[in-house]
Design a protein with these regions (language model features):
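C-terminal catalytic histidine-bearing segment of alpha/beta-hydrolase fold enzymes
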Residues: 443, 449-451, 455, 461-542, ...
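Active-site machinery of serine-nucleophile hydrolases
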Residues: 312-379
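Structured interaction patches on ligand/partner-binding surfaces of diverse proteins
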Residues: 210-235
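Short Pro-Gly-centered beta-turn/loop motif in secreted/extracellular proteins
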Residues: 186-206, 210-212, 220-222, 559-563
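A short, amphipathic beta-strand motif
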Residues: 152-161, 169-171
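A domain-start/cap signature at the N-terminus of enzymes
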Residues: 229-313, 575, 583-597
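Hydrophobic/aromatic-rich core segments of domains that either
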Residues: 1, 10-22, 26-27, 32-123
Length: 611
């Protein structure tokens, strides 16, 4: 039931004796909370179950709680360490075998409704003697395996700061032979559950964990505990190698604060690991020149021009016209688009629209398909994610009008040729270059008149917002829908621009196709029509228009602000954060898992609710 309800063991839970509802709500519980949840689940389907535990193991290492169920007799199962259908098993069997019946500190007690003359020792609330109990220690004394004479149980624990960490532990004797190896237990396991080896008494060993200083030990007693300290960066490296970037979202390790000097090498590691994973997963689709998202397929054609060094090549995504026509017509438009423009440098990509409808390039599947196309070109073709450009003619121009504002955080510039904007607005174009070319006589759907209106609007926006809305608008005299390729002048103008991944000011207007992420902002539940303005002024961040945005995430990194100094965030005039922020692997991993964009990975995050 724990995995099904996304509940995990953690000493970070709010309190020890959480109700089932509190545990389900928080997703975290100690062995006590997990036991209460399991007991409630068993009783709800008619399985008798009761709470069991000890105030203190006889070796003084801590306390523990678990569950007994009735199956012809009382049998136990772990709560923090479930064993499935196997009963009377658990890591604590040996510990329980040392229980001392009749000792209020070291006995094992089971909760009961009967008048028993005993009370259950609640270690988190010792003055409360209201829970009746039975001393069931005798049944556990027989469960432990006998320890051979001359041997001792040696426990191993690896820590990163205050967190237990799962790492490969090797025990090496003086001759250099590995006599024992295994993985230490992390925070998913009970705090008293350790990797254990049976070793001869009075023997000497060296204990090694990669990334930690080796520790020399002498085996002196049973239940001996050996602790090793691991630095954060090697621990993160090991976690990523074992479980990928997702491992840093699931563990406390990913939330430990990073120093400024650790953030960059960790970023390189995360980018490399995620890049290897995506390269393996997507190689076939890239070679097939066809992408798929949500059951929709988008073939594409590409040609390279005067290749720059890997990682510095530009990408030009060129959208064909047509739409609202038979597939054969749109196929011909695709063929035309392949040869319409040439580049001085870069990768020229002409995708085939997934549908033949009038709105070829601005349906909700286009954005994720283009994001995936950009990611793949970065991975396989050495494209610089800061030099990505989109352009389109006719119906392709319609797409540019719509895609450029809502995908601006992934673009350097956009070129609109002979298209119609429909309902879209230019607000989101603030931080990219935008070229608009139109034939003066292209009167169908009032394209020429609307282009003239956009020329005025863009000029006004640029005048009122210094440093924003760079644009080139050319209305070609004497030209109709076909401009005799005069619009090619847009390409060298666009090529002057590089993406600004961390603009000090951004305007995020959600279109009918909504996005969860835009530059250094993100929302949990995007809503069409919301318009957010966000500005960085030194260490202060001011956000306006976010009243309807719900949960808003402000993502930061060094360079945009100084993360070693306090940061203040104002949301619609209300101060919602003031203080220093931690750089964490969790935030970095989440950014890369959302989108493989190595130049747009943030290290810190402030989560704000609606004021």
């Amino acid at each position: 039931i724990f995995a099904a309800n996304k509940v995990a063991y953690s000493t970070k839970r709010k309190k020890a004796d959480q109700s089932p509802y509190e545990t389900l709500e928080s997703g975290l519980a100690s062995c006590t909370g997990l036991s209460i949840l399991l007991i409630s689940a068993c009783r709800s389907v008619g399985v008798p179950a009761r709470f069991v535990g000890t105030p203190l193991w006889s070796d003084g290492s801590g306390n523990h709680s678990w569950v007994e169920i009735w199956d012809g007799e009382w049998k136990f199962t772990g709560a923090a360490e479930p064993t499935g259908e196997a009963l009377n098993q658990g890591w604590f069997v040996d510990r329980a075998a040392g229980a001392r019946s009749g000792d209020p500190r070291h006995a094992i007690f089971a909760a009961t409704w009967r008048e028993s003359g005993l009370h259950f020792p609640l270690v988190w609330l010792p003055e409360n003697r209201s829970v009746r109990a039975l001393d069931v220690s005798e049944r556990y004394l027989k469960k432990s395996a006998t320890i051979p004479e001359g041997l001792a149980r040696v426990r191993f624990r690896v820590r990163v700061g205050e967190l237990r960490f799962s790492a490969a532990v090797r025990v090496i004797d003086p001759s250099g032979t590995v006599t024992f190896e295994g993985f230490s237990k992390d925070e998913r396991f009970d705090g008293n559950d350790h990797l254990t080896a049976l070793l001869p008494l009075r023997s000497r060993y060296e204990v090694r964990v990669e990334g930690a200083d080796p520790v020399s030990i002498a085996v002196e007693r049973d239940e001996q505990l050996v602790e090793l300290e691991l630095a954060l960066l090697p621990a993160l490296h090991g976690a990523v190698e074992q479980g990928g970037l997702e491992a840093l979202l699931r563990s406390e390790l990913g939330r430990l604060p990073l120093g400024k000097g650790d953030a960059q090498p960790l970023l390189q590691l995360l980018v490399e690991q995620q890049g290897k994973r995506l390269t393996a997963e997507r190689k076939a689709e890239h070679e097939a020149r066809q992408l798929e998202w949500g059951g929709v397929r988008m073939p594409f054609w590409s040609q390279s021009f005067s290749a720059a060094p890997p990682g510095r090549r530009s990408l030009w995504i060129s959208m064909h016209g047509g739409g609202g026509a038979p597939a054969a017509v749109n196929d011909q438009q695709w063929e035309n688009q392949k040869r319409l423009y040439t580049l001085e440098e870069g990768v020229y990509v002409a995708p085939r629209a997934p549908t033949d409808t009038w709105n070829l390039w601005h349906q909700d599947h286009i954005d994720p398909l283009f994001s995936r196309l950009i990611e793949n070109m970065v991975l396989f073709e050495g494209v610089d994610p800061d030099r990505v450009y989109i352009l389109g003619y006719s119906a392709g121009g319609d797409g540019v009008y719509q895609l450029a504002p809502r995908m601006a955080d992934q673009l350097a510039a956009a070129g609109m040729m002979a298209g119609h904007p429909n309902e879209t607005q230019p607000d989101g174009l603030r931080n990219i270059g935008f070229a608009l070319h139109m034939g003066a006589d292209d009167s169908a759907y009032n394209r020429n008149q609307i282009a003239a209106q956009w020329k005025e609007r863009l000029a006004k926006l640029a005048a009122e917002d210094k440093g924003g809305y760079a644009h080139q608008v050319v209305i070609h005299a004497g030209k109709g829908h076909w401009m005799d390729r005069e619009e090619r002048a847009a390409l060298p103008w666009m090529a002057r621009f590089k993406r600004v991944p961390d603009p000090e000011k951004l305007i995020w207007l959600q279109d009918d196709v909504v996005h969860r992420r835009y530059y250094w902002l993100a929302v949990d539940e995007p809503k069409a029509g919301t318009r957010i303005t966000a500005v960085v002024e030194g260490q202060n961040i001011r956000i306006e228009g976010a009243k309807e945005a719900g949960v808003l995430r402000v993502r930061l990194r060094d360079g945009l602000v100084d993360l070693d100094r306090p940061v203040a965030v104002y949301r619609d005039g209300l101060k919602v954060h003031s203080g220093k922020l931690s750089r964490t692997a969790e935030v970095m991993s989440r950014c890369l898992l959302e989108r493989y964009d190595p130049q747009a990975v943030y290290t810190a995050e402030i989560v704000t609710g609606a004021p």
